[in-house]
Every structure is written in C-alpha cells, then in structure tokens.
Amino acid sequence: MIPDVSQALAWLEKHPQALKGIQRGLERETLRVNADGTLATTVHPEALGSALTHKWITTDFAEALLEFITPVDGDIQHMLTFMRDLHRYTARKLGDERMWPLSMPCYIAEGQDIELAQYGTSNTGRFKTLYREGLKNRYGALMQTISGVHYNFSLPMAFWQAKCGVTEGEAAKEKISAGYFRLIRNYYRFGWVIPYLFGASPAICSSFLQGKPTTLPFEKTDCGMYYLPYATSLRLSDLGYTNKSQSNLGITFNDLHEYVAGLKRAIKTPSEEYARIGVEKDGKRLQINSNVLQIENELYAPIRPKRVTRSGESPSDALLRGGIEYIEVRSLDINPFSPIGVDEQQVRFLDLFMVWCVLADAPEMSSDELLCTRTNWNRVILEGRKPGLTLGIGCETAQFPLPKVGKDLFRDLKRVAQTLDSIHGGEEYQKVCDELVACFDNPELTFSARILRSMIDEGIGGTGKAFGEAYRNLLREEPLEILQEEEFIAERDASVRRQQEIEAADTEPFAAWLAKHA
C-alpha cells in the first residue's frame, strides 16, 4: 500500500544537504477558562495588546479563544522555547483564569452565548468579527471552540534546486508548487497516521451532541461523557469542525491554477442552505454573504498550501502571484501531555513525514478519489486503535492491516531520519522513529489511548481542570528564556498603536466598505 520510495530515498542519501534549512512555524489555540473549567467571559487581556495586530498572540473564533503564533524558525528547540515563552507570559497575565489543555471544550452549555472575538472599530476588524458571526450562524458556536495546533513547513530552496533543477522565475514557481501539491496528495492518502499517533480527542461532553441523534456507537460514563473505545480524534470527525456542504466543491490538488479556480468558484457559489439564514435581519448583519464560503479561509481542509499575503491580497491571489511558499498542517489535536500543546517528538515526526510526502510518487487525484481518501481518515478517527482495522487505497477494494502499513511507512521514515540526523548530528530523528513505530504493535501507547484512560477515570472536565491547573502553576513559575518582559510590553504597545492607526486611516462607512469586499 505504501508507494515504493527507494529510488527517491537513495537520491536523498546522496544529497543530504538538500534538507539543510527546513523552516517551520507553530500556531496553538487554547480557550481561556475559569478555575471551574467554564469559559471565561472576560475580554481579551489588556496585557496581551491588540488581537488584531499583535505579532505573536491573537484570538481565533471567540474572544476567549487565544491563539499563539511563533515566527518562522529553522531551529526546533528555539521555536518550541519561543512558544513556551508566549505561554509563560500569558499564564502570568490571566489572573485566576487558565488555558484549557484539551482540543475539545467541556463546560459550555448548549446555546450558551459565546462572545465572538472583537477586533476594534476599523472596517477590517469589524469584517473579521462578522465572518465569525457567519461561522456561528452556519455551524454553531460550540463547534468553533474546538482547538488545535497548526504546523507550518517549508523546504529550503536548495532542495528544489537539487530535486527539480529550479533556478528563479515563473518555471521555478510552477515546479515548486507542483512539488508541494505532490506532498499534499500524499498527505490526503497517508496523513491518517497523524491522528493515529497524536489524536487526543477520543471523547466529547454530552453538550456537543446538542440533542441531535447520532449513528455513532458511543459509550457513556456516569458523568455524561460520550466516548468511542477505539477513537483517536473526534475533533476531526463530522462531530468536530467539518463542513459537509464543501465536499462537492470539486477542489483538487493537482495544479496551482486548477486549485485556485476551485477556491474562487467556491466563494462565488450561492448556497441555498446559507441563504435561508439570511444576510441581514432587523438591521443586523448575520454573515458576509450566503455563498458556500464567505471567504477563502472558510474552506475546511486538513492541510493547506500557503503564501504570505500582501496587504489587501486574498490567499488565492498570493498563490497565483508567487506559487506555494509553505504548507500548513491542520490535523494536530492539542497535545494534552505538553504545557504548550505540542512537543519536540511531534515536530520531528512531522518533518520526517513531510519530507516523505514530497519524495513519494503521488499520482494525480480526482475529486472523487479525494473523497475516497476520507474513508481511511474516518476509520482511524473513529476506531483507529481497533484490533484488525484495515485501510484501503483510494476508491479500490483491496484492504491492508493498519499496523503493517504503519510499520512499512516507518521503515522509509527511518531512512529520512538517518539523513536528517547526518546533517544535524546526533540521533534525534531516528529516536523519534523508534519511539513512535512501537505504537503500531501497541496502540495503548498512542495519545488517544493514554488520555482516554484519564478521561474514563476523571471525565473530560476533571482531566482538563487537573492538567490545566498543573500547567498554569508550572508556566507561571518558569523564567522567560528567549523573550523578555520588556519585549512583551513593547509589542503590546506597538500592537495597540497599529490598531489605532488602522482605525484612523478608515475613510468610508463599514456598509460601503463591505459592499466592495463581500
């Protein structure tokens, strides 16, 4: 089932320097909660500056949903320590609040009024909040409070020069984009390995079902927790943040222009379902528009091709201008065993897997096959640790035992690990392979199995409160290592100033501005 990568690996072993200079970044979302685990109803802390313009600390869907962002970094330890400093500083500024350590929230009642993230009075800020109003009205606010970790990854130019002979200009843009699309297609085919190893949301609180019937064979604990005994990541299931209305958009990952055309089509395609919500009611705007996607960011995807946008530029226009610059991996649950929601083992594994995905052959993929890849993901998400579980290839009928496929994949990853270790010295990447491959013979070692044991004993709420309290105490005590208090204060003040400048520069009323942007 695993493609034959032996030639590509032999090439890599002859050109190890092609991997020198991998760049990464991390984003981590987390809810601010009170000591009893309920959602904080306070505004974004003043000490953290403006959520609209702060470089490292912002908000996602809700006012209480923090998002931490590291700068692009070539050094794993430095990036993780930077992320830890953001957590350390924030933990000291949250008063009695703490950061929820799980992907799935718990103490949020059905229909509870969840304050949307606020970004000030500028047209840009109001647009961001209106987009969130649309998400709330389309999918429900509860779904939007699920948190995850995003891992951004790019290969050095030396890789593309050695692999594809690229120089500069239009041809380089096309070749590099084609290489990243190959990575993405392999990710759709084999990325289920991420929830298998690192999924950490095997259970949900009953409020998540919102009284709706479900066909999933949930088991229920006395405290009202629902779980699937072999599930890995319910966050990635249809109970979590997915969008069924997007499944027939026909967006594919074979070619840059084809992908962008699909994305642009989706933001212009009217939706009957969302038209029923209405765009405005009693003078209040309910969504940006009633199309399948309000804006491009609404496209639900476990991985995204990206390029840093210029002012006023859409993500797809940035891709057309310069091609794919980096990849955003979006399938990581919060790691409940780390105070910062992610750890070094995961980052090193993702490095290995991304390199494998870009090396392995990846035939072009129709939108039908893309839908078929979802079958493997769903199996792993809902019953990944089940003995005897099998996986298929695309829409074909042949089945393969998951542990065998996993071990075959790791045989290749071990060779990538040897190459990366040869550049950096040490055996860190190989060690990660040895630790993780054991999860295929013993699923009890996976994150989902480990956290489920705690959840069955303590409930989701009890587990979240205990871990959150321990991490709060730890982070508040630890000294800052990379950033200093003065730098946080300077960025707080600068971010507030930047927001004020944006607000002062606005010249037209929001309604007129929106008419041009909706």
UniProtKB/Swiss-Prot annotation:
Primary gene name: gshA
Enzyme class comes to: ligase
Choose one Gene Ontology CC annotation of this protein and give it: cytosol
- Please provide the record's keywords in A-Z order: ATP-binding, Glutathione biosynthesis, Ligase, Nucleotide-binding
A GO MF annotation of the entry reads: metal ion binding
- Could you identify this protein by its name? Glutamate--cysteine ligase
* Family indicated by similarity: Belongs to the glutamate--cysteine ligase type 1 family. Type 1 subfamily.
Which GO biological process entries does UniProt record here?
A: glutathione biosynthetic process
Q: In which pathway does it act?
A: Sulfur metabolism; glutathione biosynthesis; glutathione from L-cysteine and L-glutamate: step 1/2
Catalysed reaction equations from the record: L-cysteine + L-glutamate + ATP = gamma-L-glutamyl-L-cysteine + ADP + phosphate + H(+)
The answer to whether keyword Mitochondrion applies is no
EC id:
6.3.2.2
